[in-house]
């Protein structure tokens, strides 16, 4: 069993790279089966705004990297400088740290655990999880729970949603005179909507592809909803735009923003693009009256209050180190399984051979007591031939070591 994690995250790659290797959840099952067919025995894919990671059971992690590049129609060398490949123990520790929020842009954030569980459910339904990854993720979720229960890692955590609100306050001051637009209606937008709603802006509007889901979210925050198709005509109405959809292509183009700014008579517009791939064309941020921030730009704000959680992080790391050691012990026992199986199969062949001989002798009328005696002697000789021959053939230190091992194996204490 060879465990590897291959991936990119917010510390190794900018959003312009991460968006090129991101996966939408609805495409993950097909992607996993495709990865499986390229020599990867087991696989799960975790894809969020901050990371894309492949958890694999494979002899050759290079295959996973090449598959990732080919799947997204990229050259492997284009993403290789941003990728990390973590083998065995490092992969286990990484999974535990990710689920516990220690590897997040927002230290201690809880959202990643739900995202990881969803990734595992998708892999399970796709049939790409085996013994190794099942056990890894079972332990991962257990460790994450232990970390959150026994440390204050999640205390005073500044989420991306909260960071967006703080940044808007830095631009506008109080938010009670602003019109706010949310594009999308997923979990991230829901969190942002709750934070902005608490500041009682002039209006809250949710734009979504399907009106029903948009209306549902809008109702929960005392806002209104609109269709995404109406965005080009209505963008100018809003001072603050927060977007996070699963679109593979930008929803808000440079031209749309230029028209909105002209219609607003160059009144500033604050925009936060939390999507990966990005929802807003980055060129829009170059306009004089547009303050455009991506998920990477929020990093500085979410670092605030980090010092308060460093002690909790150290406690969490200690728990994780201990649990990694436990998992590696399990993994070592699993590596002996093929040998144990082969040993049992060999013993079973000897048993069946001698049993067949005994049955033939009994059928010919031989004395049952003598047949049983011959059977037991033959089995003893067959089963001990290998160890005896190895011990007789060994010399020097090898012989001493082998003798000690055999005494331990057969529990010979005299």
Curated annotation (Swiss-Prot):
UniProt enzyme class: oxidoreductase
MF GO annotations: glutamyl-tRNA reductase activity; NADP binding
Keywords associated with the record: NADP, Oxidoreductase, Porphyrin biosynthesis
Active site: 49
Similarity annotation: Belongs to the glutamyl-tRNA reductase family.
Assembly information from the UniProt record: Homodimer.
Protein name per the record: Glutamyl-tRNA reductase
Species name: Methylobacillus flagellatus (strain ATCC 51484 / DSM 6875 / VKM B-1610 / KT)
Organism ancestry: Bacteria, Pseudomonadati, Pseudomonadota, Betaproteobacteria, Nitrosomonadales
């Amino acid at each position: 069993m060879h465990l590897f994690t291959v991936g990119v995250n917010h510390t190794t790659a900018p959003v312009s790279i991460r968006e090129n290797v991101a996966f939408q959840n609805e495409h993950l099952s097909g992607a996993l089966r495709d990865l499986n067919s390229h020599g990867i025995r087991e696989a799960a894919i975790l894809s969020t705004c901050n990371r894309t990671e492949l958890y694999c059971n494979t002899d050759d992690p290079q295959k996973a990297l090449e598959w990732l590049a080919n799947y997204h129609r990229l050259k492997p060398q284009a993403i290789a400088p941003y990728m990390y490949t973590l083998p065995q123990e490092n992969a286990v520790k990484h999974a535990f740290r990710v689920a516990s929020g220690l590897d997040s842009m927002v230290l201690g954030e809880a959202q990643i655990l739900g995202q990881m569980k969803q990734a595992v459910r998708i892999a399970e339904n796709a049939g790409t999880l085996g013994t190794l990854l099942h056990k890894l993720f079972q332990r991962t979720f257990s460790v994450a729970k232990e970390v959150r229960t026994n440390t204050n890692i999640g205390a005073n955590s500044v989420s991306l949603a909260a960071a967006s609100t703080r940044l808007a306050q830095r631009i506008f001051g109080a938010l009670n005179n602003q019109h706010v637009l949310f594009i999308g209606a997923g979990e991230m937008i829901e969190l942002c909507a709750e934070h902005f709603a608490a500041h009682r802006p002039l209006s809250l509007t949710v734009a979504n592809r399907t009106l029903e889901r948009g209306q549902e979210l809008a109702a929960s925050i005392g806002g209104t909803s609109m269709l995404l198709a109406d965005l080009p005509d209505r963008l100018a109405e809003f001072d603050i735009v927060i977007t996070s959809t699963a679109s593979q292509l930008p929803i808000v183009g440079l031209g749309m923003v230029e028209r909105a700014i002209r219609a607003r008579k160059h009144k500033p517009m604050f925009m936060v693009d939390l999507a990966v791939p990005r929802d807003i064309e980055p060129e829009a941020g170059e306009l004089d009256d547009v303050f455009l921030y991506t998920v990477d730009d929020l990093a500085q704000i979410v670092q605030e209050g980090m010092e308060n959680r460093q002690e909790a992080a150290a406690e969490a790391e200690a728990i994780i180190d201990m649990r990694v050691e436990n998992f590696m012990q399990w993994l070592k026992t699993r590596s002996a399984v093929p040998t144990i199986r082969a040993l049992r199969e060999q013993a079973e062949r000897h048993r069946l051979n001698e049993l067949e001989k005994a049955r033939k002798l009994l059928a010919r009328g031989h004395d049952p007591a003598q047949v049983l005696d011959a059977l037991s002697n033959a089995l003893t000789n067959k089963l001990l031939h290998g160890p005896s021959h190895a011990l007789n053939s060994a010399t020097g230190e090898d012989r001493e070591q082998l003798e000690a091992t055999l005494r331990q194996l057969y529990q010979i204490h005299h």
